[in-house]
Amino acid sequence: MKKGFTMIELIFVIVILGILAAVAIPRLAATRDDAEIAKVATNIQTLISDLGAYYTSQGKFATKTSGESTSVDIPAMTNVSNPVKAKTDNCFEVIGPSTTSGALEVTVGTAGLCSKIWELPGLKSVNDSLTTTDNKKYLKFGGIGIDWNK
């Protein structure tokens, strides 16, 4: 007598593997999204922290001049890429310096996973602290604008 699996036993194994795959794959996708949200949230907080530390130590932001325009030199102040993206969506981007001392113009994206990122408690408070003027959002650093050089 030959020993081996019957056709019915093999079909049952295939069905069980299919059920396990149907349950595991959506959970794996959700875990990947959660990991992406955590990574982006950490990058945004690190970017803001690095910019604040640079502004506190130097009293100004690093800038670079290209022709007649001046922009903020993000790579000189942090290793976090600008804009901060969740997959392909921009969640946070530093646009440039504002006319107000110690403030940067920023954009906050809410597409895709970005909407979930801004619901996190730490980043919700950051989003709430942004000031809006003329439909532009600004992130304020430093104190009340005291200039010790005068």
Segments from the language model and where they lie:
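A general marker of short, structured functional hotspots
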Residues: 1, 8, 24, 50-51, ...
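N-terminal single-pass transmembrane signal-anchor helix
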Residues: 1-29
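Short linear sequence motifs
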Residues: 5, 21, 47-48, 131, ...
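Helix N-terminus capping/helix-initiation residues
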Residues: 31-34, 111
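Membrane-proximal N-terminal amphipathic helix
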Residues: 33-62
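Periplasmic/extracellular, small/polar-rich flexible segments of pilin-like filament-forming proteins
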Residues: 53-150
